[in-house]
């Protein structure tokens, strides 16, 4: 079975190299539990796991305590990352971006926050990106077995 860390490497590819290095140091059991990666400009890098929200240390560990020595991501790194997620063609993803998200290969959804550009009452673009929230898509085998068994009873 492919490990979660291998699956996550597709997501890690989009992270700035400096931030990616911290994630690559994480133990596999931590990677197995990541459901979201939260990146906010000039704030510590955080993840969401089954145990709640935690921060990533520069040593590749998890910390439940926010401190000044945690790695932060810059606004410029967030902009570069979104550009990479858009295949270096932000314009071709503009309709997704104005809806606040893009979808990566493999089904991971990436929420995008920034300043909305509004024309005639409609959001037409997003600029000055401030945060990215990567929701990790996972296959959970058998999760609907009980439901599908019930639906067969009523046929």
Task: Annotate each language-model stretch with its function.
Residues 111-112:
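A short beta-strand signature within small-molecule sensing/ligand-binding domains used
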Residues 97-100, 142-151:
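Short, charged beta->alpha transition segments
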Residues 153-155:
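Conserved small/polar residues in nucleotide/adenosyl-binding loops
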Residues 44-46, 119-120, 141:
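Short, acidic Gly/Pro/Ser/Thr-rich loop/turn segments
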Residues 1-106:
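N-terminal accessory targeting/assembly segments
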Residues 126-147:
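N-terminal pre-Walker A segment at the start of P-loop NTPase domains
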Residues 85, 119-120, 124:
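Beta-strand/loop-dominated core regions that host nucleotide or nucleotide-derived cofactor-binding catalytic loops
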């Amino acid at each position: 079975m492919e490990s979660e860390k291998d699956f996550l490497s597709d997501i890690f590819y989009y992270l700035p190299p400096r931030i990616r290095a911290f994630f690559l140091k994480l133990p596999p059991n931590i990677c197995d539990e990541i459901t979201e990666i939260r990146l906010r400009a000039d704030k510590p890098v955080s993840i969401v796991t089954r145990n709640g929200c935690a921060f990533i240390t520069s040593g590749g560990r998890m910390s439940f305590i926010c401190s000044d020595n945690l790695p932060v991501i810059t606004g410029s790194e967030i902009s570069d990352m979104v550009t990479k997620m858009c295949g270096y063609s932000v314009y071709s993803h503009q309709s997704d971006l104005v809806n606040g998200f893009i979808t990566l290969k493999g089904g991971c959804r990436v929420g995008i926050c920034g300043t909305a550009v509004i024309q005639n009452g409609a959001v037409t673009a997003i600029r000055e990106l401030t945060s990215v929230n990567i929701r990790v898509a996972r296959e959970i085998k058998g999760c609907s077995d009980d439901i599908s068994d019930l639906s067969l009873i009523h046929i």
